[in-house]
Amino acid sequence: MVSVSEIRQAQRAEGPATILAIGTATPSNCVDQSTYPDYYFRITNSEHMTDLKEKFQRMCDKSMIKKRYMHLNEEILKENPNMCAYMAPSLDARQDIVVVEVPKLGKEAAVKAIKEWGQPKSKITHLIFCTTSGVDMPGADYQLTKLLGLRPYVKRYMMYQQGCFAGGTVLRLAKDLAENNKGARVLVVCSEITAVTFRGPSDTHLDSLVGQALFGDGAAAVIVGSDPIPQIEKPLFELVWTAQTIAPDSDGAIDGHLREVGLTFHLLKDVPGIVSKNIGKALFEAFNPLNISDYNSIFWIAHPGGPAILDQVEQKLGLKPEKMKATRDVLSDYGNMSGACVLFILDEMRRKSAEKGLKTTGEGLEWGVLFGFGPGLTIETVVLHSVAI
């Protein structure tokens, strides 16, 4: 007779969850940030709001973003004028777009990750899909399973409406799945399309305007598994430790509400302050067990909610400017793609590390941190261990 403890022992993997491949994708429509205010105020029939346009121009100039990618183009917006108004009923039109395009963009990223992984997709045992762009039943996880031709009995997890901390959430869940199911290979996909949040300007809702200056579309996919097969699977980063916490005294700091007008969001001015005030505690809990207190000695992947958050975190911790380079590069080239951002940054970091001939996937360093920040205010922390190149 086999005992339950023996069954549990046999079910568990031996090594830590490991990222085995990364893929990213964006829509083909690229938007230049320097000319975006002209386009945005024209397409939303708001050119008469000259003072607000100047304010929006300053927001775009200070955003540290050079370009973004958006599924919504002029043709689509002209066909859906209610999406261009500030608060017109438009949820049906938005939903019609995202329920199709979110899984499609996710598929593009997933195909790249599966190709890099080099294993047949039939070996994928679990699927985690995450999006804040629309909701549907069956969900985007089901649609992606069909689009990719995954096995019908793949174990699916659909995470809707998590917001910008979700890149950390999906890695935390993938780690638990990979380490507790021997031989599991988890496909993780974050896909975001701003069709749910795009709307015209209002001088009474400036936090909405901040979002119009920052948000972009993108999808990222990773494959996570423990005990990589030697010579066949190539590890990139090990997921060593994870945590999630709600920052104290942060109620209402970041809110999103799905309404007839689409997804509205509200930001308190002091979001960067709340993040920087709580980051030290999160780092201490993560790295004190490793006897690491010099946060310039680790590599950094932080959700680029906006330049002010990164600036205040750097200042609070005394980080060298190069620590946030990969993070700032992704913000500059793609904007804020919500949960997908940190996975884009992982991809950027391992590529640049290889190009520069560094010793590890983590800029030549051994240990690193990945942070997600989002509604709550919620902070996700992931301790990463890099792999020798």
Swiss-Prot record:
Which catalytic residues are annotated?
164
Which of UniProt's keywords are assigned here?
Acyltransferase, Flavonoid biosynthesis, Transferase
Q: What reaction gets catalysed by this protein?
A: (E)-4-coumaroyl-CoA + 3 malonyl-CoA + 3 H(+) = 2',4,4',6'-tetrahydroxychalcone + 3 CO2 + 4 CoA
Q: Which InterPro entries match?
A: Chalcone/stilbene_synt_C, Chalcone/stilbene_synt_N, Chalcone/stilbene_synthase_AS, Polyketide_synthase_type-III, Thiolase-like
Q: Carries keyword Transferase?
A: yes
- GO BP terms: flavonoid biosynthetic process; polyketide biosynthetic process
Q: Name one GO molecular function term.
A: naringenin-chalcone synthase activity
Q: What is its pathway?
A: Secondary metabolite biosynthesis; flavonoid biosynthesis
The protein's Enzyme Commission number: 2.3.1.74
One Pfam match, given by its short name, reads: Chal_sti_synt_N
Induction of its expression: By irradiation, elicitor, infection or wounding.
PANTHER family for this protein: CHALCONE SYNTHASE 7 (PTHR11877:SF62), HYDROXYMETHYLGLUTARYL-COA SYNTHASE (PTHR11877)
Described function: The primary product of this enzyme is 4,2',4',6'-tetrahydroxychalcone (also termed naringenin-chalcone or chalcone) which can under specific conditions spontaneously isomerize into naringenin.
The UniProt family comment states: Belongs to the thiolase-like superfamily. Chalcone/stilbene synthases family.
Q: Which protein are we looking at?
A: Chalcone synthase 17
